[in-house]
């Protein structure tokens, strides 16, 4: 899917994300920017294009398995695509995303994001 998703409004229009999902993604983006200063979670230049590079790229996976309720993001790193999938599926009963990473520091970041 090729689409210009340069901001939260465009992301909402492209995905049908509601206000709470957008607020949760903004919160995630804030955590990502803050923690990225301490450890290299994503390339610094990609923070400026969060909506197209991270949120939209991650959200595009959902339509490929529309009935899937359980997802595993192995080697999740910064939580992509897992955190975005979890936010987008939050209102679906039984929807779960498992985030798996081998580095303790990244797991600390992920725990901070999801709590």
Positions of predicted regions on the chain:
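Conserved alpha-helix/loop element of class I SAM-dependent methyltransferases that forms part
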Residues: 34, 38, 50-69
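Conserved SAM/SAH cofactor-binding pocket of Class I
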Residues: 59-115
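Broad hydrophobic/π-residue packing in well-ordered secondary structure
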Residues: 25-29, 35, 54-55, 80, ...
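N-terminal auxiliary segments of SAM/dcSAM-dependent transferases
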Residues: 1-44, 48
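Residues at secondary-structure transition points
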Residues: 23, 45, 49-56, 80, ...
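Extended aliphatic helical segments
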Residues: 5, 22, 42, 49, ...
């Amino acid at each position: 899917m090729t689409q210009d998703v340069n901001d939260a409004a465009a992301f909402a229009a492209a995905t049908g994300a509601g206000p709470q999902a957008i607020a949760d993604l903004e919160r995630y983006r804030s955590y990502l920017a803050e923690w990225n200063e301490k450890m290299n979670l994503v390339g610094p230049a990609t923070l400026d294009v969060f909506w197209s590079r991270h949120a939209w790229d991650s959200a595009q996976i959902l339509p490929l398995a529309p009935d899937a309720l359980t997802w595993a993001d192995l080697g999740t790193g910064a939580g992509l695509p897992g955190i975005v999938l979890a936010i987008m599926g939050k209102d679906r009963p039984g929807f779960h995303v498992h985030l798996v990473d081998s580095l303790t520091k990244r797991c600390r970041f992920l725990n901070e994001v999801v709590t």
